From Swiss-Prot:
Coiled-coil annotated spans: none
Gene name for this UniProt entry: rplQ
GO cellular component entries: cytosolic large ribosomal subunit
Protein's recorded name: Large ribosomal subunit protein bL17
PROSITE patterns xref list: RIBOSOMAL_L17
Species of the source: Gloeobacter violaceus (strain ATCC 29082 / PCC 7421)
Family: Belongs to the bacterial ribosomal protein bL17 family.
Highest rank taxon of the organism: Bacteria
GO BP term (any one): translation
Amino acid sequence: MRHRCRVPKLGRPADQRDALIRTLTTELLRHGRISTTLARAKVIRSEADRMITLAKDGSLAARRQASGFLYDPELVQSVFAAAQERYGSRRGGYTRILRTVARRGDNSPMAIIELV
């Protein structure tokens, strides 16, 4: 039974939520840091860490799994090429969330998520 296994809904249906998480994770890995809401940053932190862990593994199965999640095939190649020397000694915690000022229109808490 999956009692108390809650998924942050982010105010969207499941298919839109999955697409949003994939898009934000792809952009985070491409640019290194993005600004988004705090709730979205907390959700994509785990997905970005999972992609970097797959890149550190470097196997063909891990590469195929990452290319099925990320939208950009060239990004998969660059992440897998740079992950071993950048995060080789680190055992997790590849991202950092910095809280910023609230958004002006609706006062939602904003954050900057960046790769360490």
